[in-house]
Regions:
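P-loop NTP-binding module
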Residues: 1-170
Length: 170
């Protein structure tokens, strides 16, 4: 864990981007905990989990973020990876568009891998945000750099929760 400290960056003007798990209503807390338990007890060595939905505004980004936070609450190294490059709820909800280098910058070759990983207030949870909006997200995430990123993050984290775009066109 100490080695991680040398490459994790501070998120500028970081605000708490999701309520603490304990601040959620009981039913929401329980749903997140059941999901977390199902992942842990699946029998598979699930390390990278994609969260998606049929259409926008169904709550996938909130679920993905809170699931990451819940796993970190168990002292598991957890990474929230925002891959909704065209329409990131997390970036827009918290007004971070011009404040961070993110996945887009890395995939376009203008930022190093270590420059896009940000720590949160939870020492077990980090985030990679989308960064700039890109006109060609499918091409970016299907390239070699995305594969390299996932391979490296698998070494650093117990869980990687990937917030993906909705399945149906936006």
């Amino acid at each position: 864990m100490e080695q991680q400290q040398t490459w994790r960056r501070e998120l500028p003007n970081y605000k708490q981007v999701a309520p603490e798990i304990d601040d959620l209503p009981f039913q929401a807390r329980e749903a997140i905990n059941v999901l977390r338990g199902n992942i842990q007890l699946s029998g598979a060595n699930l390390k990278v989990i994609a969260i998606t939905s049929a259409v926008a505004h169904e709550g996938k980004s909130s679920i993905a973020f809170r699931l990451t936070k819940s796993l970190a609450g168990l002292k598991k190294r957890a990474l929230y990876l925002d891959c909704d490059i065209r329409n990131s709820v997390t970036m827009s909800r918290y007004g971070m568009h011009d404040q961070v280098q993110g996945l887009t910058e890395y995939l376009c070759g203008t930022a190093a891998m270590n420059d896009i990983v940000y720590r949160t207030q939870d020492k077990y949870m980090d985030v990679i945000l989308t960064g700039a909006v890109a006109p060609n997200p499918s091409e970016l995430v299907s390239g070699k750099l995305f594969t390299l990123l996932l391979d490296e993050m698998r070494k650093r984290y117990d869980y990687i929760i990937v917030d993906t775009p909705p399945i149906n066109p936006v």
